Amino acid sequence: MALWGKAHASATNKPKYLPTDENSDYNRGDSYATNDGWVMKAGTPASGNGNADADPEILVAIGGLAGVSSTTGLKAPTVTKMRFVVGNTATTDMTAGDGTQRILVEITYDEEVTVNTTGGTPTLVIANNDASGGGYGNHTLSYQPTGSTKNQIRFEKTSAGLGNTDVLTLGGSNIVLNSGTIKDTADGSTDASLVLSGLSAVAITVSS
């Protein structure tokens, strides 16, 4: 098995020796493709400094990897990972039972992306199976620039009605642009993929 890849639209191209643990300094999610190759995001623990504007560390040198158009390199940014971001407070840790919680998710791409909300704000629907019987229904999250960095973008609903034992699922619905845009930063014009259904769905259960 190759240690990394460069196939268009593959979710498994990133260097495989990088751990998937979010707490690791070399978390795979912080790796993405540029036209220099596979790099590690600047400003992360792996970079050795907190300067997010510094040049990223090149892990695997591959000229033209990201591409300069929709027909070169990786062609278009592809989603490689998605997750719920769980906090440690009463309204962010999914343990409020029957009450309101913040729902925050992070979508990771294999390339740097640029989100433009001038025409509208991208959204993402989180399914709720309503196991509690409270009738809270699905939740629509909106793009949140705070916490979004380079190849990772976040969607949030700050006050969502949830019931104890409700199961929330990420991945059943794709990103909706609502006249906003999510573009490949490498060329400035290629649309990033909005498809989440190619990955395994991620679920979280509300508790008390």
Features from the language model and the residues they span:
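Non-catalytic beta-sheet/beta-sandwich ligand-binding modules that flank or precede catalytic cores
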Residues: 1-208
